[in-house]
A protein has these predicted regions:
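Intrinsically disordered, low-structural-confidence terminal and linker regions
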Residues: 1-14
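His-Asp-centered catalytic microenvironments across diverse enzyme cores
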Residues: 3, 125-307
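Secondary-structure boundary elements
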Residues: 16-94
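Short glycine-/small-residue-rich flexible loop motifs, especially phosphate/cofactor-binding loops
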Residues: 26, 107, 346-347
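Short amphipathic alpha-helical segments
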Residues: 48, 52, 98, 102, ...
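Active-site neighborhood of thiol-dependent amide/isopeptide-bond enzymes
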Residues: 72-141
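Extended, charged low-complexity segments
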Residues: 261-268, 274-375
Length: 375
């Protein structure tokens, strides 16, 4: 039987060299605004522990947007997820990507800082909340990290920042839960199996074998019942660059558009932001979460004790979809902008997400599904 917090068979993750060097890792730390002054001379002193892993994840999803603009505003209409291209796009240019780019960058950077980690893959659920799941193929990337020295205790990390993204590491344990962006949101892990699976624990048990994990998000509401949704399922197998590249090609070429058309039919852009002190106090009081301060924040849904640090500060989300820009804080959503032209959209991308699309590149979106009125 699999032990709580461990990979199957008690497997250990070995120390694996990063594809980024110390200078690149130091530049990444500076770009995401990790506290301190970093260079190739001192990045080897980074303390690769669980709390710092949490801070790195949160800083990444604040610094970089979950976005697919390269699919539509470039002549090649592709999403380059190679290691050199990701460094240039994120660290040099300050732009973003979707999960393959975000988590590949994060994996290689935390390896450069001394973490033991590998990447796996998941199946996105496209069904709405409170309904049976509708899983795609393996089109999502997740990370497994063993941040404790001399231990094989394992945490799941997703630093992609899209949708109702998880915002801190979560223990690989059935029933583990963590607070989401704010106290009104919770993420949980459940180990289960698909009802259509051919596998079972023992003959004629009629119980599906628990061979996959599911990340579930729960949202409280001010005016209605709590909603629950399976975000994705994943397995513990290690996946590699070629696996992600094949899935990536299927997405940006539209080969899978009949099953998943979100990125082909839309400009998608989302990014987390830090709540102000006033917003923080309001969220903590409103959600009556003060009694959860003593629970473990990585497995029992505890609320980090509010000390004005970035580890304890809640997050909000900005989301650009269709022709609207929305700001989400806890249970509240505010429409900031409504736009109808490409000039308006690229102005919003620049102002709110730091993504600079040259006016000359607008010609590349002409005739594509998400195109708006062009100059």
């Amino acid at each position: 039987m699999q032990q709580d917090g461990q990979l199957r068979d008690g497997l250990w993750i070995k120390q694996t060299p990063s594809l980024y060097n110390k200078t690149q890792a130091a530049n990444w730390l500076s770009r995401i605004k990790y506290p301190g002054s970093w260079s190739e001379d001192n990045v080897g002193d980074f303390e690769a522990d669980l709390d710092n892993l949490c801070l790195l994840q949160r800083l990444q999803i604040v610094a970089f947007a979950f976005e697919n603009t390269a699919m539509h505003y470039t002549s090649h209409h592709s999403m380059d997820i190679s290691v050199p291209a990701l460094y240039r796009r994120f660290v040099v240019e300050g732009k973003g990507s979707y999960c393959f780019g975000q988590n590949t960058l994060f994996l290689q950077m935390i390896r450069a800082l001394g973490y033991r980690a590998y990447s796996g893959s998941g199946r996105i659920n496209t069904a709405p909340a409170d309904s049976p799941p509708n899983f795609l193929s393996f089109v999502h990337e997740v990370l497994f990290v063993q941040p404790l020295k001399g231990s094989n205790i394992t945490y799941v990390v997703d630093a992609s920042g899209g949708g109702s993204c998880i915002t801190r590491p979560i223990l690989l344990k059935n029933g583990a839960k963590v607070m989401g962006a704010s106290p009104s949101e919770c993420h949980a892990l459940v180990k289960t199996g698909r009802v259509e699976s051919s596998l079972e624990q023992i003959p004629n048990s009629k119980e599906p074998a628990g061979v996959e994990w599911r990340l579930i998000v729960t949202h409280a509401s001010d005016s209605g019942p709590t909603s629950t949704r399976i975000m994705y399922s994943f397995i513990e197998d290690e996946f590699f660059d070629m696996d992600y590249e094949c899935s990536n090609i299927g997405i940006y070429t539209g080969a899978w558009a009949e099953k998943e058309s979100l990125f082909m039919n839309n400009i998608v852009c989302a990014r987390c932001f830090w709540l102000s002190d006033e917003e923080m106090e309001a969220e903590l009081v409103k959600n009556s979460m003060l009694e959860t301060f003593e629970c473990d924040v990585y497995s029992a849904g505890g609320t980090p004790r509010w000390d004005h640090s970035l580890r304890s500060r809640c997050l909000g989300r900005l989301g650009l979809y269709a022709n609207e820009l929305k700001r989400h804080v806890g249970t509240r959503t505010e429409t900031l902008k409504v736009f109808h032209t490409e000039m308006e959209r690229i102005a919003i991308l620049r102002e709110f997400f730091g993504i600079d699309i040259a006016q000359a590149d607008l010609k590349h979106i002409r005739g594509r599904p998400p195109a708006l009125e062009l100059p």
